[in-house]
Amino acid sequence: MDRVDAPAEQMTPATDAAADSHQVPQSIDILKIMQSIPHRYPFLLIDKMVEIHAGQSAIGIKNVTVNEPFFQGHFPSHPVMPGVLIVEAMAQTAATLVVMTLGKAFEGKLVYFMTIENAKFRRPVGPGDQLRIHVDKERSRANVWKFKGVARVDDVAVAEATFSAMIMG
């Protein structure tokens, strides 16, 4: 078995109406994420997905290190992860959920950010923090999906936003 695929007992069928009949892994590593979305260093902002509920929700992980390039200028003497990058990590988690849900129906397409609403930043995120990024699909119609995202560090909400994305290609 390829190490990027979950064992059969950890697979769930895709539940979105647009999805073909395929099995969706419940978790994936960075290699599978990189097969799913086009982002790369320094803009790949999720390290793994620890939960995937096809067509419904997902949890992604971002391990924040002192080596992040954005800390060079935000702020050198007191490093803080920019809030907009936390929202981007939510969007990448959601995009990966879309790709995993749609399977072959997604081939040749990309997920593009459309809107960000009600973004709130509750506390700074810095080196050593692990972001646990929860995204829930609120609804979808045709190629537009709307999500609610919450990022947590040590079970404390640090950021939240509602956002939508469009599948194009």
Swiss-Prot record:
CDD domains per record: FabZ
Organism lineage: Bacteria, Pseudomonadati, Pseudomonadota, Alphaproteobacteria, Acetobacterales
Domain of life: Bacteria
GO terms classed as biological process: fatty acid biosynthetic process; lipid A biosynthetic process
Residues that span the membrane, as ranges: none
Database matches in Pfam families: FabA
GO cellular component, one term: cytoplasm
Function summary: Involved in unsaturated fatty acids biosynthesis. Catalyzes the dehydration of short chain beta-hydroxyacyl-ACPs and long chain saturated and unsaturated beta-hydroxyacyl-ACPs.
Organism per entry: Gluconobacter oxydans (strain 621H) (Gluconobacter suboxydans)
Family classification: Belongs to the thioester dehydratase family. FabZ subfamily.
Subcellular compartments: Cytoplasm
Entry protein name: 3-hydroxyacyl-[acyl-carrier-protein] dehydratase FabZ
